[in-house]
């Protein structure tokens, strides 16, 4: 546990110390594999590239499309802790609705509660048990940016994702997870 927290601290500190990258937003969300495995996910979003395009339709309405490529390192808790940076591509329309596709790779440490073993003296003692995994995820995010119409610097989103953990079983194991959250914007884009 100490090592995982130390690695998470080093990763976060190295990203935050980068002079060219400023955090775009911070987020917190419900994160769960199913209703029976609820968890919490928190993180920061960094925008690596941004561009927008305005199109005028035949009826005279303007359509603004904003695109960005983002990096979102996050720390989450489900049946363990994970550090999972994500690369994502996002499109947002003039009404504030957005669609984001993302992929990520990181580390997950699971914990198994109430595990006991015999020590050298033959006494029963509680031990820390769990596994280390390489974790990948693939996600699509559907959301609404409330700052477009209501001037509130918050976005709300739903993010279904497929996660794949190695080593587990013979060929790894897949998880379907759902994330429901809110993001507070620190910048104007």
Q: Which residues does each PLM region occupy?
A:
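Short glycine/proline- and aromatic-enriched beta-strand/turn motifs that initiate or cap beta-hairpins
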Residues: 18-80, 185-189
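Generic structural signal for short, flexible, solvent-exposed coil/loop and linker residues
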Residues: 4-5, 29, 60, 127, ...
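Sec-dependent N-terminal signal peptides
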Residues: 3-12
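A generic structural signal for short, non-catalytic loop/turn and secondary-structure boundary residues
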Residues: 11, 19-21, 151
């Amino acid at each position: 546990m100490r090592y995982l927290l130390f690695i998470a601290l080093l990763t976060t500190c190295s990203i935050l110390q980068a002079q060219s990258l400023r955090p775009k937003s911070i987020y917190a969300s419900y994160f769960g594999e199913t209703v029976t495995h609820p968890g919490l996910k928190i993180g920061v979003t960094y925008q690596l590239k941004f561009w927008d395009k305005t199109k005028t339709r035949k009826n005279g309405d303007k359509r603004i499309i904003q695109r960005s490529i983002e990096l979102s390192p996050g720390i989450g808790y489900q049946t363990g802790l994970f550090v999972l940076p994500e690369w994502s591509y996002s499109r947002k329309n003039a009404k504030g609705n957005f669609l984001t596709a993302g992929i990520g790779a990181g580390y997950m440490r699971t914990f198994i509660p109430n595990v006991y073993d015999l020590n050298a003296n033959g006494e029963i003692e509680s031990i820390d048990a769990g596994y280390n995994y390489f974790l990948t995820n693939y996600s699509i995010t559907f959301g609404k940016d409330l700052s477009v119409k209501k001037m509130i610097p918050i976005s709300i989103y739903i993010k279904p994702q497929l996660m794949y953990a190695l080593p587990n079983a013979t060929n790894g194991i897949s998880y379907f997870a759902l994330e429901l959250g809110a993001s507070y914007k620190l910048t104007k884009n």
